[in-house]
Amino acid sequence: LEVGTGSGYNAALLSQLVRRVVSLEIVPELAARARNLLRCGGFDNVEVILADGSLGWPSASPYDAIVVTAGAPVIPATLKEQLRPGGRLVIPVGDLALQQLIVVQRTEEGFQTETHGGCRFVPLQGKYGWQ
């Protein structure tokens, strides 16, 4: 699962590594443009969905991996819960100026979290984003 389709570039890269990519975009114009670009590029294993990515996409869960390409104020529990055991969530978390890149792995016992340094992403929009 990718949260934040944007231009579709990351979804195109991910599509070369995995069988199927579900990518969520909250901005209608970006979703339509990315959908068109990906189709024209022959990336048939990418599905772009207009949705609030901070909620994830439960109907296609559980996921092996979730990549969030926008900075969040907190890690949305909704995304963690959609991970398969052994799955990983990569998400930038912090304030609007600076985030830390967080990797969450779901285990049989719960969740393990690692922090991997500073980064800066556009703000996550939606219910669990910056609104």
Roles of regions detected by a PLM:
Residues 1-112:
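Conserved nucleotide-cofactor-binding alpha/beta core module
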Residues 113-126:
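Conserved histidine-centered catalytic loops in small-molecule metabolism enzymes
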